[in-house]
Amino acid sequence: MSDDKKAQYAFVHAAVWADDIKDPAHGYTKDDDTPTGQNIGYADKNMHRYWHFKDVRFSTDGTQFVDADPINAVSQIKLFVAALPTSSGASDDLRSYDMVWLLHLIGDIHQPLHATERMSAINPDGDRGGNEVNVMPATGETIDLHGYWDRMFGGYVSVPGAIFDANDKGGISKLQVDSVKAKILDPDVWTHESFVLGKKFAYEEPVLSENTVAVLTRTYETDARN
């Protein structure tokens, strides 16, 4: 493996660590009932599942709702970014921990269903970013809506596989970078963009009206991929 790919391996592997620790085998505590925005480094043994998203809520049937908890992906991105410069006085341990989380959360918040939650009579407490909504894509299996959109970004069983797809298949080289948007560093702006996309495309028909399993149309799946 070349030095460049070794460096990529480290970053790709680090970027999924925040999901890896959800596995009880890693010894981290599921703490969803006690949200906290603490930043103490690797001594923190909580999973912090609620750091992975910011639920911007909406309803299409008049269901009333309140804003979600203020501790979320955006609050943590801001906290971690502030600790990264050496001028922050934070320890190397803390800055390393924050970098690992940032690699993950910035990716999460660009997935529309990490920034969108529909409130409805069927799910008055919210659909948890599509986790409570079942859909059937053209492949024929039933999957939750959130998982369907997660797969839009690729799924790999190994870090080298992800790197191969990004490099050797021209994944990165084919990306067209919007130089104006690339200068937008405000996570609130990223989140709003994801919310707009989620509301428009993730919850379009047949998902919008179906209360059991939404059989996805070709139009829906084409819009999702694009």
What annotation goes with each model-predicted range?
Residues M1-L105, P112, E117-N226:
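N-terminal, motif-rich segments that launch catalysis or mediate targeting to/interaction with membranes
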